[in-house]
Amino acid sequence: MIEVVCNDRLGKKVRVKCNQEDTIGDLKKLIAAQTGTRWEKIVLKKWYTIFKNHVSLGDYEIHDGMNLELYYL
């Protein structure tokens, strides 16, 4: 079980607990449950890498305590 921190730079910082086998789409659904936005409208980035929904967190080497950038469409 890992904890990922997502910051949208607008004052909202979300901490989500998930597994490394979970996909980015699963992570977006957990974030959407906490923020109240639809998961389809969420974009997760790290630097210039936009994360795809079907790839797992382990494949992107997302570890415990990692910060991701949260954007809305």
UniProtKB/Swiss-Prot annotation:
An annotated GO cellular component: cytoplasm
GO BP of this protein: mRNA splicing, via spliceosome; protein modification process
CDD domains tied to this protein: Ubl_UBL5
GO molecular function: protein tag activity
Gene3D superfamilies assigned: Phosphatidylinositol 3-kinase Catalytic Subunit, Chain A, domain 1
UniProt superkingdom: Eukaryota
Subcellular location: Cytoplasm
Main location class: cytoplasm
Ranges for domain Ubiquitin-like: 1-73
Keywords (A to Z) from UniProt: Cytoplasm, Ubl conjugation pathway
Family annotation (InterPro entries): Hub1/Ubl5, Ubiquitin-like_domsf
Protein name (Swiss-Prot/TrEMBL): Ubiquitin-like protein 5
Organism: Danio rerio
